[in-house]
């Protein structure tokens, strides 16, 4: 009798498990990506900073902060590529710089993205915000284009193709490039939402954006609050459905044009950039409040980070006069190879798994998101998926952090310069900044400087003392690791993969030539 009851119980439980539409173990996931937000712009990361960010600080107090987090690139497009694919951006056909608003799609439809991974594992997936990974515009004629198209050739009455919906997103709503790059239109599920009715530009110090066609429903200073409004609508709708959701929310701010709305102008007492950061903080607070109000906070993971360091458009001189430094204690800023260009604020709140107020000092990279999600879902990635993505899940508790597998991290600048970091040491394979700060590439700034740069970030976080030549064994080891990372097409364990051809020139790409 007992045996019969046992089998009936097991059968009943199996029936419930096999027929349950929603797996409550799978967390909802919201990934908020700020644009050009400096490490030192958030109070919890820079206590001497002068911008008040109470809501992001609150998010941090409810979760975990990562003090040694890095974007895979120091500029926009490449970092986004790395987040969505778990692959270093320089393995793609874009070896340096960024795309513009009319560029073709960068991510192949054949490549797994975090959205397609989650969609295939029962998630409802959404993208709302700044895309900046290219999509294919419909043209007025049959002209073929490989890289980017002239604005006057675009047919704004037809749908785009090879956009977010083809890369795993069930729902998509956003604009193509940065908010200073035309065309200025919203695209919802491949369809342009408004008619072009004007050509506009702005030449203001902070409000600057390029001249271009603009849709009737597109107002620059309303874009950021509009995206948050759409995000609220998505979350409210999807949380009622019988499946977990993933929302990728890449903001167009505080990147140029720097346009705080009424109520926030002058709020910081510093300048428009600081006002804009405070406005973003407010929106993040409203998003966090919504999750609490819907009673889904316990098993909702919220990630907040930035795509790279702060841009000089923030007006560093004026901010410094008021004792605020967007890069905090670090050297450099957006576009370069120094820490201020790629060390970013990084927060994860997930009450079900993360103890509030936690801190991790381990080095992580924005490419690690795919590996983390695969680990959470207990999904084994295929050999060509997430090739540079190491699960951060072990870092969510002190007991398991010994299982974190990332041994080194590679950094990349706007002009294609590289650096590699392992432990305390960072080895930069150029004698300049690789970007916009001193010493500038292609200038006389680097004359007389050593070929490479080596810094001990533990003793010299500001990268002020070049140790190149003083530690030959460390340098040799780091060069070997870098060479293997290039030639193996991956940094995770697995079969050798191929890096993509250079684009649009298709010339041979060989960063190892710097060692000859």
Language model features: what each stretch is:
Residues 2-5, 18-453, 461-494, 499, ...:
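Formylglycine-dependent sulfatase
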Residues 4-13:
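Sec-dependent N-terminal signal peptides
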Residues 458:
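Phosphate-moiety recognition in structured ligand-binding domains
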């Amino acid at each position: 009798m007992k045996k019969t009851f046992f089998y009936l119980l097991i059968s009943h439980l199996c029936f419930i498990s096999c027929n349950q539409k929603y797996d409550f173990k799978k967390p909802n996931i919201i990934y908020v990506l700020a644009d050009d937000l400096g490490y030192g712009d958030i109070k919890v990361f820079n206590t001497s900073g002068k911008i008040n960010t109470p809501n992001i600080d609150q998010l941090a107090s409810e979760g975990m902060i990562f003090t040694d987090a890095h974007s895979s690139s120091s500029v926009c497009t490449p970092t986004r590529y790395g987040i969505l694919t778990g692959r270093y951006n320089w393995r793609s056909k874009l070896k340096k710089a960024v795309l513009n608003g009319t560029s073709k799609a960068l991510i192949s439809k054949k490549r797994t993205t975090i959205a397609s991974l989650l969609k295939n594992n029962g998630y409802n997936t959404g993208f709302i915000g700044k895309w900046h990974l290219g999509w294919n515009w419909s043209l007025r004629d049959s002209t073929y284009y490989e890289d980017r198209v002239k604005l006057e050739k675009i047919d704004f009455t037809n749908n785009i193709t090879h956009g977010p919906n083809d890369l795993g997103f069930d729902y998509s709503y956003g604009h193509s490039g940065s908010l200073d790059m035309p065309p200025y239109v919203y695209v919802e599920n491949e369809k342009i939402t408004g008619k072009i009715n004007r050509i506009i530009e702005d030449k203001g110090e902070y409000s600057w954006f390029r001249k271009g066609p603009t849709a009737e429903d597109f107002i620059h200073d309303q874009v950021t609050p509009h995206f948050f409004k759409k995000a609220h609508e998505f979350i409210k709708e999807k949380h009622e459905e019988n499946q977990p959701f993933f929302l990728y929310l890449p903001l167009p701010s505080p990147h140029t044009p720097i346009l705080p709305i009424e109520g926030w102008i002058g709020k910081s007492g510093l300048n428009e950039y600081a006002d804009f950061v405070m406005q973003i903080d407010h929106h993040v607070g409203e998003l966090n409040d919504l999750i609490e109000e819907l009673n889904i906070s316990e098993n909702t993971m919220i990630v907040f980070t930035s795509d790279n360091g702060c841009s000089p458009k923030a007006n560093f001189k004026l901010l410094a006069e008021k004792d605020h430094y967007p890069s905090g204690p670090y050297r450099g800023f957006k576009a370069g190879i120094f820490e201020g260009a790629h060390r970013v604020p990084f927060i994860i709140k997930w009450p079900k798994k993360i103890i509030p107020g936690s801190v991790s000092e381990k080095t992580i990279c924005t490419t690690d998101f795919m590996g983390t999600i695969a680990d959470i879902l207990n999904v084994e990635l295929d050999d060509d998926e997430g090739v540079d993505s190491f699960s951060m899940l072990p870092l969510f508790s002190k007991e398991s952090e010994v299982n974190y597998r990332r041994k080194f991290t590679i950094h990349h600048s706007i002009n294609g310069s590289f650096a590699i970091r392992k432990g305390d040491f960072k080895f930069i394979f150029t004698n300049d900044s690789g970007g916009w700060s001193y010493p500038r590439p292609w200038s006389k700034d680097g004359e007389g400087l050593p070929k490479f740069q080596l810094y001990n970030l533990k003793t010299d976080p500001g990268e002020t003392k070049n140790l190149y030549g003083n530690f030959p064994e460390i340098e040799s080891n780091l060069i070997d690791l870098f060479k293997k990372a290039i030639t193996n097409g991956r940094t995770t364990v697995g079969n050798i993969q191929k890096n993509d051809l250079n684009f649009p020139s298709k010339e041979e790409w060989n960063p190892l030539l710097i060692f000859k």
